[in-house]
Amino acid sequence: MQKPWVEKYRPENLDEVVGHQEIIKRLKNYVEKKSMPHLLFSGSPGVGKTTAALCLAKDLYGNTWKENFLELNSSDERGIDVIRTKVKDFARTKPIGDAPFKVIFLDESDALTSDAQNALRRTMEKYSDICRFVLSCNYPSKIIPPIQSRCAIFRFSPLKTEDLVKNLKEISEKESINVEKSGMDAIIYVSEGDMRKAINVLQTGAAVSKNINETVIYKVASKARPDEIKKMTELALNGKFVEAREQLYKLMIDWGMSGEDIIIQIFREVPNLEISEKEKVHLVEAIGECDFRIVEGANERIQLSALLAKMGILE
């Protein structure tokens, strides 16, 4: 059975990591000196936090990296018992081989409960001589200040377009698939700097066709073309509510798009609309209100239809 491409092409060391040059440079410095503080990696999903932690461990420990590295996903194991058992049991034992310390990687650590984070803080203090913690999170504000103050903080930004394109082209060549420019542009659009999403979309598209264009990508990603979203929005802004709503229903039924997906794509199109700055402000406010109501459980079609209606009377 073929491995997912995100695993098949995951970097094996820090030299292979795509993007984040400054962060990688600092991590290599830790490897060279065999010394590092506790680390906190923050950033949106798919930008390389887990990969950086794994590559750091492999470069630090070589063949014994699995014995000296513990990875836990805090969103699955988020309670205080995990800190008291798995984490503490691993932290209290000495490193294997000539490693100066062990590394515990807590992925999605912002999902840990407050009690678990306080227990973690005490564990970090107690075993700091033989163990280092690498915490990964999407929202650093959810990490308690005492933990943040004990860590060197690394902020991972969404990957640049050139980094995404370079990596996707290398994978395409190895898998003998042809990605047209329109297909590559579509992958960049739907992934929004998320390498994991970009590779997954590429693999899904390759399962449909060995010649990948924008039609294939938007279909497998369940996203509308930007020009279709723009067309719907402009119809609504010009007071053609019925036509705009028909376009909306087409997107939701034919493309299987969720209300949340459509809201995000409308929001991304706002800067490109030929309306005044004041109208853009009012439109963003209406989009925010619609998004809030959908998240709270309101009917998606009704809320999006109401948003299209408001567009026709923007001031």
Swiss-Prot record:
Signal peptide span: none
Family matches, as Pfam families: AAA (PF00004), RCF1-5-like_lid (PF21960), Rep_fac_C (PF08542)
Species, as recorded: Methanococcus vannielii (strain ATCC 35089 / DSM 1224 / JCM 13029 / OCM 148 / SB)
Keywords: ATP-binding, DNA replication, Nucleotide-binding
Entry's Gene Ontology cellular component terms: DNA replication factor C complex
Identification of the protein by name: Replication factor C small subunit
Gene Ontology terms describing biological process: DNA repair; DNA-templated DNA replication
Residues engaged in binding ATP: 43-50
An annotated Gene Ontology molecular function: ATP binding
Subunit structure: Heteromultimer composed of small subunits (RfcS) and large subunits (RfcL).
Family, per entry: Belongs to the activator 1 small subunits family. RfcS subfamily.
Function: Part of the RFC clamp loader complex which loads the PCNA sliding clamp onto DNA.
InterPro entries registered for this protein in UniProt: AAA+_ATPase, ATPase_AAA_core, DNA_pol3_clamp-load_cplx_C, DNA_Rep/Repair_Clamp_Loader, P-loop_NTPase, Rep_factor-C_ssu_arc, Rep_factorC_C, RFC_lid
Gene coding for it: rfcS
